[in-house]
Amino acid sequence: METLSRSLSKSLGELLASNSNNHFSRRSGSTIDDHDEEALKWAALEKLPTFARLRTTIIHPHEDLVDVTKLGVDDRQKFIDSIFKVTEEDNEKFLKKFRNRIDRVRIKLPTVEVRFEKVTIEANCHIGKRALPTLPNAALNIAERGLRLLGFNFTKTTKVTILRDVSGIIKPSRMTLLLGPPSSGKTTLLLALAGKLDQSLKVTGRVTYNGHGLEEFVPQKTSAYISQNDVHVGVMTVQETLDFSARCQGVGTRYDLLSELVRREKDAGILPEPEVDLFMKSIAAGNVKSSLITDYTLRILGLDICKDTVVGDEMIRGISGGQKKRVTTGEMIVGPTKTLFMDEISTGLDSSTTYQIVKCLQEIVRFTDATVLMSLLQPAPETFELFDDIILLSEGQIVYQGPRDHVLTFFETCGFKCPDRKGTADFLQEVTSRKDQEQYWADSKKPYSYISVSEFSKRFRTFHVGANLEKDLSVPYDRFKSHPASLVFKKHSVPKSQLFKVCWDRELLLMKRNAFFYITKTVQIIIMALIASTVYLRTEMGTKNESDGAVYIGALMFSMIVNMFNGFAELALMIQRLPVFYKQRDLLFHPPWTFSLPTFLLGIPISIFESVVWVTITYYMIGFAPELSRFLKHLLVIFLTQQMAGGIFRFIAATCRSMILANTGGALVILLLFLLGGFIVPRGEIPKWWKWAYWVSPMAYTYDALTVNEMLAPRWINQPSSDNSTSLGLAVLEIFDIFTDPNWYWIGVGGILGFTVLFNILVTLALTFLNPLEKQQAVVSKENTEENRAENGSKSKSIDVKRGMVLPFTPLTMSFDNVNYYVDMPKEMKEQGVSKDKLQLLKEVTGVFRPGVLTALMGVSGAGKTTLMDVLAGRKTGGYIEGDIRISGFPKRQETFARISGYCEQNDIHSPQVTVKESLIYSAFLRLPKEVTKYEKMRFVDEVMELVELESLKDAVVGLPGITGLSTEQRKRLTIAVELVANPSIIFMDEPTSGLDARAAAIVMRTVRNTVDTGRTVVCTIHQPSIDIFEAFDELLLLKRGGQVIYAGPLGQNSHKIIEYFQAIHGVPKIKEKYNPATWMLEVSSMAAEAKLEIDFAEHYKTSSLYQQNKNLVKELSTPPQGASDLYFSTRFSQSLLGQFKSCLWKQWITYWRTPDYNLARFFFTLAAAVMLGSIFWKVGTKRENANDLTKVIGAMYAAVLFVGVNNSSSVQPLIAVERSVFYRERAAEMYSALPYALAQVVCEIPYVLIQTTYYTLIIYAMMCFEWTLAKFFWFYFVSFMSFLYFTYYGMMTVALTPNQQVAAVFAGAFYGLFNLFSGFVIPRPRIPKWWIWYYWICPVAWTVYGLIVSQYGDVEDTIKVPGMANDPTIKWYIENHYGYDADFMIPIATVLVGFTLFFAFMFAFGIRTLNFQQR
């Protein structure tokens, strides 16, 4: 930077010398002094050419001249630090300077006014049982879609109105807040305004920007929708993510604005402030890797502390959820777009962080004339005050839209008043709800009667704000007043070549970050190369006859298969990246080809390296043709095969778009290419209806090129064949029906190269035209509609429900004294010089939880709230616990305690395919004592559903969080209900209101309160609650960072006791009127406050009378009451092993029945594979003339079992992975033993595999025309069934033995190659070297192929022709001598197959029982 400054100073010095008599006058009283160095430099700056002038500025404190495009990281950071010392205050000051500069020369900034008029959005969906994701329903859906394509429509769907006749105006320079309960249509409205609605929705009405319809410009570049889903590349850092976004979005009109600004300033003789000039020139300079706008955005969003941390995902630990949410916001505001639709951007953030971000956004809106519509979940009062306008949406209708100042007045005219200790936002979200409305009725002259949303909407139109809105809408926007730069008319504002460079840089970065993946792939290649080389070792290989040639062909085939399937990893890699790609494609960040081309080009060096590694190890160890030219030609084919394989797997991923479909569809495509590549079925014997597939199979060209290159080498050509009629090489090629012309090597190379190019073009086309399979769309759920209908009474009956419960329980007290908790010192801290071996997370925590008392467990992030709860509940899987924990005076024993306690986890983990009621029945039947009758259990389930207000949702499928099924708030209530049906005495709840809007949080807290009122002991961790949620608690246990107690005791009316306690401490500021006591309490007890007051709140608490009272209470409750006995259960679990198995089987059966994407996919794959195999090997069972016929049959059996089996194994892994996380929760609650659970999962697979095997066997057996004898058919069926079953259990086992699904897939895949090599087809058993023969006997596929062949041909005495043999042997003799198959071995084969099946099932159960990958 110093060199740059010197060179600029030199050039500007020359300009100064020639223009020393120029004078500029500063406005606002600033005058240029001829002797002022800074003024001279500004004067010289004005003489630079326009392009250079717009990139050069003066930087303080040394008045250096710099090119803004060459500012270093440190320079940018210093600038940001100097300008933004206190973010909120300094951001406002800086933006004010920015706006003053523009206003001084009277430049009008472009603005956008968004109008929506009479917008109605409807969706068609299935309802009732037809909507459940069962196998028949899924099959019907597929059939209906097919018929619709043919022009027939028999689909019976129900129309759901999401938005009903909504109109409004989003004005520039004003912050608009969008409020509404769940399923009110907020997301749909935001998507509609951003022009991003799903095409399947029916939309009427009109959305305009400055009077222009969405079709007249490019809305994706004019506005930005900021999703509530955080979709990012996990291995990129926060700064890299924002820099990529900034480079893709470009600078928009910033450069034009700056150019005009500088021109006018020059004409007017105005000098800008250096800081503002530097900032504006930096953010207007395009094509820089990292810009000042990124640093600015990081600072205002509070992300600068984690800018160099990777974002993270399920596999990689990264930033927190709240920080990830801010990255999603930053990714869009870093661009030039000033019209923003922001969807729930504060989820996971505490109220102070939310306030800071919204405040900064408010300043941007005010000073840059931006247009912002933002939806928030639980805006605190101080955040709510930052907005200018409010839109209140409920049941798809607008209840209010207009200035914030008038919203309470409107509801007061309707008879409702917001209480003093209630946030306005919370009030607005509850006042339209039937359950909550009555409490706000304030008109004492009239009796309360429910006012519906439609009635509110009607009244708003007559209210003066509504009338003014209608008046404004009636006057069309004058299109001619629209600033030329307001709307964007080009799809990409950055040159395509520049976008390619941006994507290239990102791809290179991702390859570096994924180095472990590529290293693992290379290691896998090396291991497979060494295994192949030692199996086909040259000392064991001959070149004397056709049989030797066949072994070499087998080695070439295996080499081709390994390198072809080396590209399989591209499948998961591509699908993993698709969500981010689709998001960025739809936002018009870059065209699809800039994504696919760098992936292809940067894969070339990796393929070269892997190919060289493979060929270097295998070529001479196996003993292929020794000429260097043939080595290089072999290497070229292997390299091109790897490139082609990468292309084909990326194409499959881009087309299928999900792992299940890609595994199924991709495996079918590969099976077809594999079968018709010319090596399993010789070219001449492929049925005429499949001939076309041979010519379009890339593997055929690879196979031809490799075999022609090898077999036309001198050592094969100069050796005569066994009948001396031709050369041995040509004879081998003729036996396998391979082309004998040497030109076929180059034809093969050309074919592979052509397919490589073709597949990469197809990848780009698929990325361009296909959309995500499950595009997120906000739809009012049927459950919500039912809930509304069910509430037609004037009052919710659940409010007045009798709190008695059907089943009795024993109220219990939990006391704990001096609890300490330690973990091993993290490695990172030891590296920083920490000498201790243990890190203390809880320190001398003492307290009591009592029946009928609702206790809040609070503290700042890192205080140890969840840690304390996990320690007390016995959920910790590691660490060291000290202290005395007692239940009603008796020492706590975990196995007993688990039976009488419930734990509601924050993550709401449930089986996704069962309904709400089924979830509760399952929990009740496993956790209630076996003495309770079935009738009582069912009655108790109904009682609990009523208590937690889930009656109207009882038939709703739970679904996956954030994707399908229940909303977040409904899942919270289900989590509570699942624990309640166990009839516990003590319930722990971890963050029951996190991620909920105010109304949903109120519903959950009402559920919690109802639970406490039954006499149970309830403890909740809570984070930044609103006033009314905080004051719903009876007692508080407050922790400071370090796990120390600073308050334990009652809250009191209006929190007066906690307020009095802290205000009594000298120096603690008094609470402001109407301020949230929870927020105040955390602020005054923070570490910063401790440092300021020079006090340790934990020590102060220990010297207080409150502490002594608590110690006395703990001492009193630590002694059992006279005559009391400790809890005792005769068995560990409530149910017997048989009872546990029956309940687990019941739930697993439902899960399988409602998982059509798993079962239909494997059924379809098996059906398609069977029909494909049958038609390719049509009547092959009747052909017994030569050895090739037998090879074809063995090849068919081997390919079918391997592909169908691998598909079974891959497909089951995601299902088991999802259910395992549920298993961890249920096992911790002592619901069942691991054995019955594992056995139920194993048993559930049997009927599905039976069905799969039945139609597979019937199709294959009939089409291939095997002998229809009972014994042969039975053995074929049995071997196929056991094979498919052991493959399925193998997939289940890999999940149970590994920490996650991705590792399971890698672990399983590592053995598929070995199964392939040692199956007995690629190299017959007699040819396997003695040092590898042991693996043949433990390879399950080898036993399968053995059984299938022996069952069909073990007793056949027909003779066949074998090349190189003078006498024709019998088939029985040939399979025994060539393949090593003993005809009398069927019983041992059957026994071994059953053994493999049981072994894999046992290992699955063993893994589930003994391995726990959940870290707590």
Swiss-Prot record:
Pfam families: ABC2_membrane, ABC2_membrane_7, ABC_tran, ABC_trans_N, PDR_assoc. It is found in: Membrane. Its main location: membrane. The chain crosses the membrane at residues 515-535, 549-569, 597-617, 635-655, 660-680, 747-767, 1160-1180, 1198-1218, 1246-1266, 1273-1293, 1303-1323, 1331-1351, 1385-1405. Residues 147-420, 814-1067 form the ABC transporter domain. This is ABC transporter G family member 29. CDD domains: ABCG_PDR_domain1, ABCG_PDR_domain2. SMART domains: AAA. ATP 1 binds at residues 180-187. Disulfide bonds: none annotated. It is a multi-pass membrane protein. It comes from Arabidopsis thaliana. Expressed in roots and stems, and, to a lower extent, in seedling and inflorescence. GO terms for biological process: organic hydroxy compound transport; p-coumaryl alcohol transport; regulation of lignin biosynthetic process. Induction: Repressed by cold/dark treatment. ATP 2 binds at residues 859-866. Keywords: ATP-binding, Membrane, Nucleotide-binding, Repeat, Transmembrane, Transmembrane helix, Transport.
